[in-house]
């Protein structure tokens, strides 16, 4: 009985999943948090969480109603204000993601996404270290949950996770570890 109920639920969820869906250009904004850590610890406060904001845009090509591929260009900036200066971390990235909106109800669809990207990281850091900039290219994993509302509005909760640590530009002994956790809104044209 459980197998039959599962098969019926799966069939109902996939009903209409292979109908064509509109492809879109989209633009959006992101906010979130970025836990950042410098290793090995140069000073006692080398781990912190920074507020992040950003913008993104791209093209979403829909194969079917429940499956799409998107190319995206995004910029994220994480800011940590301190007493006398601000620590600024930036990520400029180009991403390719697969989206699967597997559950649809009336004007709403819900699903997951995952993909890969390449990004350029830069951080200007003044935590008691001289020559403390981190910069370099790194690969990214993109994962998250998303929902499309009324075909034009998309909200997402996701993360951009670098493949490896970013090396210090001047002192090769220090590395920057970070994850960019964000909530995003996009308008699809």
Predicted regions located by residue number:
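Gram-negative (and chloroplast) outer-membrane scaffold detector with strong preference
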Residues: 25, 33-35, 49-126, 184-187
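Cleavable N-terminal export/targeting peptides
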Residues: 1-22
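Predominantly the C-terminal beta-signal and adjacent terminal strand-loop region
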Residues: 40-43, 74-84, 88-91, 132-189
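Short N-terminal segments immediately surrounding and downstream of signal-peptide cleavage
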Residues: 19-31
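N-terminal targeting signals for Sec/Tat export/insertion, comprising classic cleavable signal peptides
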Residues: 28-29, 33-44
